[in-house]
Amino acid sequence: QGLAGRVTYGFDKRYLFEANFGYNGSENFAPGKRWGFFPSAAAGWVISNESFWDGIRKTVSNLKIRVSYGLAGNDALGERFPYRSIVAMGEESGFYYNWNSQGKGPKITTYGNPNATWEEAKKLDVGLELGLFNALNIEAAYFTEDRTGIFMRRTSLPSSTGLLGVTPYGNIGRVKSHGVDLSAVYNKQFNKDWSLSLRGTFTFSRNEVVEKDEGDLMYDYMSVVGHPVNAITGVLVADGLFTSQEEIDNSPKQQFGNYTVGDIKYRD
């Protein structure tokens, strides 16, 4: 279920505006959590269509700046109906009827979260379009995304919750990302039989985990917060180099191979 709308406006091929909205419902969520409102807006200014551009239009054939900002939603959180618990039959051990048999019963393998709802992403895009000599077209864009409410399993819960062994999922994660997109296209018609077309693209992006339920970590370097998504953390941390045999003898023993003066000294 959903409702969508769009309004566009352009004035004299110079000033452009567009607004969109989506009001979407998803059966994946419990009643009261199913609907999300996701608006967006964009504006553009074609500077090269201004009258003051006439003197350089043969050289700079197109110049346009644009910006857009909006909110997007995601209801594909993995398993469907995350607000419902999943029960497996014959999984939980019971008591012995005799020495050779054991009772089995139902077991909750996933606790449903009635507050599960949409993941949301705030997206910003700022771009520039440049045309030179009616042959070379360059586009550059800078973009950011702030994704909140990422649906993930909690690491730990207090024993007072009574949910030992299986921790529930929740909209508890947050990731920020940013980057640039560049593209260039060159088209040249030499005559009716010969033409040249070249295209190049470049993309750079980075992301960072901002919020994640990690529980109590023994050391700060084991945390994924502040690192890119899927970064390897919690591994060995170098603490300099061994400078003498005396330092090796007085340091905790490293269990992964032989080492000597000049080798890496790992933090205990």
Feature annotation, model-predicted:
Residues Q245-E247, Q254:
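Core catalytic ATP-binding domain of two-component histidine kinases
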Residues N250-P252, D268:
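Acidic, glycine-anchored loop motifs typical of Ca2+
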Residues Q1-L236:
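Extracellular/periplasmic, surface-exposed regions of secreted and cell-surface proteins
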Residues T243-Q245, D268:
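Alpha-helix N-cap recognition
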Residues Q1, T260-D268:
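Short, intrinsically disordered, charge-balanced linker/junction segments flanking boundaries
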Residues V235-L236, L241-T243:
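C-terminal segments of large proteins
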